[in-house]
Amino acid sequence: MGKDKLGKGIDALLQESSDRYDVRDSGGVQTVHYLDPTLLQANPHQARRTFAQESLEELAASIREHGVIQPVLAEKNQDGSWVIIAGERRTRAAILAGLNRIPVIVRTCDHEKKLAIALIENVQRENLNPLEEARAYQHIMDLGNLSHEELAQRVGKNRSTITNALRLLKLPPEVQQSLSSRTLSAGHARALLSLTDMQLCVSVAQYVVTHALSVRAAEECVACLNRGGSLHDYAGARAHTAASSPSPGGSATDITRLPPSSPSTDAQLDARIRNADIADIEQQLLEQLGTKVRISGNLQRGRIEITYFSQAELERLYGLLKAH
């Protein structure tokens, strides 16, 4: 049945005899072959770089009991070797479980398509860390000369999601490493993006990790620095506030609600630390527009400054604002 509908395309790729059965997907009937998982090589351009051992062992235990339910997607090279397009984690777990045959769908596609398939699977399963996802987006864009909008359509994401992910690649290597190891979240990393001094960015990232700051606290710290303050200023204000009882409606770590102290200290901190609500609105605008946004003023009156770096970027922003 599979052979009649598929013709010789896939069968020509398979010289060895193997057990097969047919499954249906959006592309029609596809033949599934049972192959030794140790023959399947990892795709060198796979976006995902790390596999948690504990997670693999849990999947291996499930595979021992139920088998590999979803076939791996792979391609056979001209030299007879097999390369995984999607399903490397399943393959690793199957080997760990001791299986000598797993279901594999054979497909031939170009490099860009293979990357897109692997990326979509990983993103849908939330397997990639934020930096792996950003690098994969960039790689596919470079290969296909795609715009943010075109890539967003291919992987089923909002354009702003793609833009915000790619901005993480501008962070210093040390901060990217923290992001890869999930020591920093994507929210923490986005808060650091407005710091233009790379060494300061690294120092703030280390402070955020050491003191286990929330994303909101990290945003407040960066806001303090962008207002002309120092990391020492922020740390002092945070320690002062944490040591005092919170005011009604405030919190022990809300540095925008500082307890009474000397007038000079209050005036300095007032000038350096923005209202948390303003910072939150600023962050939301950044995520929606995909570019740096700065709000000067307060909740009653002020000015919004939107940064762009080219005519194309200006036209894109104009289109977004006009649509709303």
UniProtKB/Swiss-Prot annotation:
Keywords: Chromosome partition, DNA-binding. It holds the Pfam family ParBc. It comes from Treponema pallidum (strain Nichols). Residues 242-252 have a biased composition (Low complexity). GO terms for cellular component: chromosome. Belongs to the ParB family. Involved in chromosome partition. Localize to both poles of the predivisional cell following completion of DNA replication. Binds to the DNA origin of replication. GO terms for molecular function: DNA binding. This is Probable chromosome-partitioning protein ParB. It comes from the Bacteria.
